[in-house]
Amino acid sequence: MNDLSDVETRLDVLPASPRGAPVPWWAKIAAKVVLARALPSYGSRKAFGLFLHGNLDHNVEQHRAFVNNVLAQHARYGGAPARAILELGPGNSLGTALFAAARGVTRTWLSDVGDFATGDMALYRAIAGSLDAELAARVDLTDRATMLASLNATYLTTGTASLAAIPDGSLDLILSTAVLEHVRRAEFAHLAAEMHRMLRGGGTAYHEVDLMDHLGGALNNLRFSEAVWESPFLADSGFYTNRLRCREIVAALQAAGFEAAVTRIARWPALPTPRRALAAPFRDLPEEELRIANFGVLLRKP
């Protein structure tokens, strides 16, 4: 079993180009505040292509590669292949249950804050058809519920509270992509403690974290005071991130009892939002910290 101190952080430079529609950040906030109230259900939002919870239902190969890479990483740092796993925030696709089963996982949990995953069985049939023939033959693809049951997989949809259903020390691996930044700031320490509770000794977790604002891929979310940003008016409008920076997230995970190693960091070549526009305390942070757009962190429970 490799030591986390052996992990070398890969450093990348992110292109400075914005993401999303070419609309000013403040106009996006105004539109999202209105639309979040006009379209309260996820189904209606998804029909209009709004407030989507990921796009892995359209990026099957990207999804497969992520799951396979995380399982391989666990084998190196967790001491044994993963048999029981949890994905936090599966979003639009429950394909992780299929990809993991193909790699020997026998118990899968998937947890989200709502029921966002597609029930379109064409996606899952396509995934199953690309996997080992024996696995494909035993997966029941009648509907989403029977598929999950045939994979010994459980889909939880009430957020952190639903993690209480997972027994202490029962997991080998926890994984997520662009999830930790969406956990409410006041709930982050509790989620970290829950992850520590659920993992066995020697178990690992891997999280990809996106620190860009969800308004165009800059730092416009750091323009607001904590009182304004954390208010329900903005926090419930579909673009909330907790604004914890890389150093704070890693420190919170270590405080929960984890060993931690940052596996990669992608930085902007320069600040995408002027420092003078940022609210306190963000405007006083070191530039190297503010320029981190996204990163990966590997955890292990001693």
Segment roles from a protein language model:
Residues 81-92, 204-229:
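Conserved class I S-adenosyl-L-methionine
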Residues 189-201:
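A short glycine-rich, Lys/Arg-flanked "PGG" loop and its adjoining helix->strand segment in the class I
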Residues 172-186:
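A short SAM/SAH-binding and catalytic strip from SAM-dependent methyltransferases
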Residues 251-254, 260-302:
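A C-terminal cap/extension of S-adenosyl-L-methionine-dependent methyltransferases
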Residues 230-247:
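Acceptor-substrate binding/catalytic loop of class I
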Residues 95-162:
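Class I SAM-dependent methyltransferase SAM/SAH-binding core
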Residues 161-174:
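A short acidic, Gly/Pro-enriched loop at the edge of an enzyme's catalytic core
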